[in-house]
Amino acid sequence: MKNTLRVAITFCAATAAAAADVAHAQARGPAAQYWVDLSTSNVSIPGMPEEGGAGLGGLMGGNSFGGSMGMGGRGKAMDTELYVRAHPGGVEGTHAIPGGMNMGPSLLLLPHRPRNEQGSVTRDETPERAEKPKGRILLYWGCGDSIRPGQPKVLDFAKQDHAEFAQFFSSHGAASKGVQGRAGHSLWPNERDSKRVPDNASLEGEHAVSGNGVPPTLKFNVGAANDFLPKVQLKTRGAPKDGVQVEWNTMQHARGYFLHAQGAAEGPGGAQDMIFWSSSEKPDNGWSLMSYQSPAQVARLVQQKVVLPPSTGNCTVPKGIFDKAQGAMLNMIAYGNELNVSHPPRPEKAPANWQPEWTARVRIKSTGMTMLGMEESREAQRDGRGQAASEPVESAAPVSLPDVANPVKLLKGLFGN
């Protein structure tokens, strides 16, 4: 009896210890996590040169972290981020890259140390109180020749209804976790390695990440399906008052497309109306969808007709939406694949206590931007309606982008931070 009791106690103790080890391992997480974000950007605006290095980004000189996050540039961008569990303050690391990147044998990863700017500058003046925005937001959606019944959806800033604002700005987007530039993580590009990603760069091939505390097995292969997407080439035809036909190049490895346009016009009482339109079959302000989405999320959105299928190559912005707008900007995003790698590889039926030694994720997108209605005016010039056909079209100064506020910033202005 005593032996049986002793065995039972020993078994219970061992089970408890094993459970504690599992819980501890789960709390620790992988020894290293690596994220890579790839982005291809293109801008098609009359007056802006089609070539010229890095496009809009090239005007700033050099390469800086965060290039894959925004829009409005031209060319390829890549951001990487490394987290090492044993060194939460960050480590100096190396990312060995394939020759097809045309950027040398490796990239340098440096710990991110955010600058504490608070208190660095003394100001005597009292901060001005932010002025409450005025006017309305008009929301349209759907491809087609005509505006659909029940549109637009209108939000009046004068009401300042929290519930209405929250409902109006809700979106179908749910970006997957990737590069964020977190403190203590090691990043590329950085102040010591700011090479630009060339237009002919390819991520295909073997990659290896090393550094203090990084497992020597952190190596992975990138195939063609997880390489940079081609650039979005937008072509528009027609004026906003008649409807604008938009065409683009379909992409082999794209999972779906989403278009979003915005403009501004004078509304009632002289206040400014902001006008939003998206290619979705359901109302969506579009802001959260203009970023990386996981393939599973994109598949759901295609099924819900929020995102256009990858075989789609055209869409018409209905007539009359932007006919009174003081310039309208059209943005498009092509969602790419997502590569998720771990070591050891995740089993099909992984137990609850399964824990990889390291993980790596590569996200891919391609974005394009153009001005609605400007393509027609350029064709008019070439056809002789604006000037003689034999007369060369002079390069105009770059067209300024319409100053349309971000809804998130508007919400902060209305309800505070």
Which residues make up each language-model segment?
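Short, aromatic- and glycine-rich surface loops/edge beta-strands on solvent-exposed regions
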Residues: 194-216, 325-339
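Bacterial N-terminal signal peptides
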Residues: 8-18
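Sec/Tat signal peptide C-region and signal peptidase I cleavage site
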Residues: 18-25
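Bacterial N-terminal signal peptides that target proteins for export
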Residues: 1-9
